[in-house]
């Protein structure tokens, strides 16, 4: 059994034991618009693993966001989110493609809120057949796949929240994420000292899950607060039980 399949089974068990109560969607404090950025994926020792392209555009009443990472080993992480921001942020559709040697398996998922239709295509390795799982799923109002840094920018200063993410095991399941503010950290930008807000994003486990499972990697994010909040960097895995990588501007 390859790690990819073991990871899916482990994630499925973890989600079954997790709390799944829905929360309210996050209020819009800073509306999103046209954005272009070029982040990079690096190991914690500073080695560059992938170059990225982040493109965000507004079309009518929807915002379309795409984050594409091309790894040096040929792997691809391609994440597309469409969301609305009429008073609150709401994920309307989500697509993710992960493939190549940097990932334990090939994965392609698609989820649409309005229709409730989802599709998952995954292959454990080159010698395994592709499996396709399709069906319908009710997307929580507070589900924010591919939107966590945006949500953190919109939290009031020094406050946290609990939101949802849809994980694919391969069937979609809801997992709660706790967004917790930590102590501010001083950072240097353009040779000027500034205070950055640091957050920990961690799955919220039920009692039995917390007793039975090993520690799951958390995501750490640094946000520059103010009248125009900015994402600085994040450290965490790009897939379940994956290595901790750093995402930051190139």
What positions do the PLM features span?
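N-terminal secretory signal peptides that target proteins for export/translocation
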Residues: 1-4
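Short hydrophobic "helix-edge" motifs at membrane interfaces and signal-peptide entry regions
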Residues: 6-9, 181
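General secondary-structure edge motif
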Residues: 10, 61-62, 131, 135
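Acidic, serine/threonine-rich low-complexity disordered tracts
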Residues: 22-115, 159-250
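Short, intrinsically disordered, low-complexity segments enriched in Ser/Thr and Pro
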Residues: 115-121
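Surface-exposed beta-loop interaction hotspot
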Residues: 121-159
């Amino acid at each position: 059994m390859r790690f990819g399949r073991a990871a899916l089974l482990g994630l499925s068990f973890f989600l079954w034991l997790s709390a799944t109560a829905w929360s309210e969607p996050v209020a819009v404090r800073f509306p999103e618009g046209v954005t272009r950025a070029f982040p990079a994926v690096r190991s914690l020792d500073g080695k560059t693993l992938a170059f990225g392209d982040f493109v965000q555009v507004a079309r009518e009443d929807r915002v379309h966001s795409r984050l594409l990472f091309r790894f040096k080993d040929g792997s691809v992480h391609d994440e597309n989110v469409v969301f609305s921001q009429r008073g609150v942020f709401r994920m309307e559709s989500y697509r993710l493609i992960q493939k190549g040697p940097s990932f334990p398996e090939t994965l392609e998922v698609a989820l649409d809120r309005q229709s409730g239709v989802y599709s998952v295509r995954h292959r454990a390795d080159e010698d395994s057949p592709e499996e396709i799982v399709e069906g319908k799923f009710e997307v929580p109002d507070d589900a924010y796949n591919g939107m966590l840094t945006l949500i953190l920018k919109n939290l009031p200063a020094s406050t946290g929240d609990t939101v949802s993410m849809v994980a694919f095991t391969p069937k979609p399941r809801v997992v709660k994420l706790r967004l917790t503010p930590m102590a501010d950290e001083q950072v240097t930008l353009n040779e000027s000292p500034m205070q950055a807000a640091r957050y920990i994003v961690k799955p919220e486990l039920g009692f039995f899950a917390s007793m039975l499972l090993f520690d799951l990697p958390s995501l750490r994010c640094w946000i520059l607060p103010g009248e125009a909040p900015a994402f600085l960097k994040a450290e965490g895995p790009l897939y379940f039980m994956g290595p901790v990588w750093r995402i930051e501007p190139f």
